């Protein structure tokens, strides 16, 4: 069996070493395709692969058509909108993610962005503190829980909204559950976004919702750019000069945001949430173990597509 690690944005070496150890211990061959740049190289590499580990790499119908021997794709990370799930099901390919492995890294970055914003991008002027501020966590999954844990250390008042997470699960962590996204945004000084990009959530973070935030509101996005209605957020930030937007996902309209909202907007140059050695190791090794479990025992615990 051949396991391909296809990462245009490579894992840290220590993570690759851990993946190799898991794969070779199971008697499988590991092949690396790193910084490949051109899709043609990926199409060639997948031809004889039985399993693929990816990060943010795109696995679409064309890639699946080329991968005649493919049985499983594992996305090393939580989000999997870079994989065409319907096409994978049509090709009888199992798709998995590795939930929770990057959660602390993403949560820590969210706080890095928060501190940068409230200290006025470190421009030498007096900023404010996070202590005592109301933090809203939009989606209380693995990352959201880590954000809540860290927020306690900052002395913040913590609120959360998650349509799929029971109130008692949220409140057992000492977090106040609210009944709607509208209530969360109207209550909180800072909102940290952790919702996935789905048909229901795309463009859902819009003018009407963000405009509910109190004066001096700060929106932090370490989720997906697709959930932001960029045109409406630009309009709102033009009208409300008190709002700030910090994102780990560069918007399509990045140049417009940067030109119009200097001092109130920041984007990382590429998605950095999972860019730590620890997250690399955790997610990469989890992906390798899931592949071994699937190929040897048929384990589909973290399957995200239909059969």
PLM regions: where:
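Phosphate-binding beta-alpha-beta segment of Rossmann-like dinucleotide-binding domains, i.e.
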Residues: 91-153, 168, 294, 298-305
């Amino acid at each position: 069996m051949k396991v391909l690690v296809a990462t245009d944005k490579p894992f840290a070496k220590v993570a690759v070493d851990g993946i190799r150890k898991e794969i070779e211990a199971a008697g499988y061959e590991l092949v690396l395709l790193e910084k490949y740049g051109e899709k043609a190289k990926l199409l060639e590499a997948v031809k004889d692969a039985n399993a693929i580990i990816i990060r943010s790499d795109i696995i679409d119908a064309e890639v699946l058509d080329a991968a005649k021997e493919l049985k499983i794709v594992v996305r090393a990370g939580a989000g999997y909108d870079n994989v065409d799930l319907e096409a994978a099901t049509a090709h009888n390919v199992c798709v998995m993610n590795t939930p929770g492995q990057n959660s602390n890294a993403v949560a820590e970055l969210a706080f890095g962005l928060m501190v940068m914003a409230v200290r006025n991008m470190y421009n030498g002027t007096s900023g404010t503190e996070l202590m005592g501020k109301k933090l809203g966590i939009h989606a209380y999954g693995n990352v959201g829980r880590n954000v809540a844990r860290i927020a306690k250390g900052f002395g913040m008042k913590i609120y959360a909204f998650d349509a799929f997470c029971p109130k008692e699960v949220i409140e057992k962590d000492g977090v106040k559950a609210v009944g709607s996204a509208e209530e969360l945004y109207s209550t909180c000084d800072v909102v940290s976004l952790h919702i996935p990009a789905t048909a229901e959530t795309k463009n859902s973070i819009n003018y009407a919702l963000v405009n509910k935030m109190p004066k001096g509101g700060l929106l932090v996005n370490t989720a997906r750019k697709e959930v932001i209605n960029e045109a409406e957020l630009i309009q709102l930030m033009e009208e409300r000069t008190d709002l700030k937007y910090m994102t780990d996902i560069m918007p399509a309209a990045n140049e417009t945001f940067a030109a119009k909202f200097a001092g109130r907007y920041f984007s990382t140059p590429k998605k950095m949430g999972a860019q730590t050695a620890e997250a690399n190791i955790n997610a990469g090794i989890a992906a390798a173990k899931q592949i071994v479990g699937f190929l040897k025992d048929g384990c589909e615990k973290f399957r995200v597509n239909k059969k």
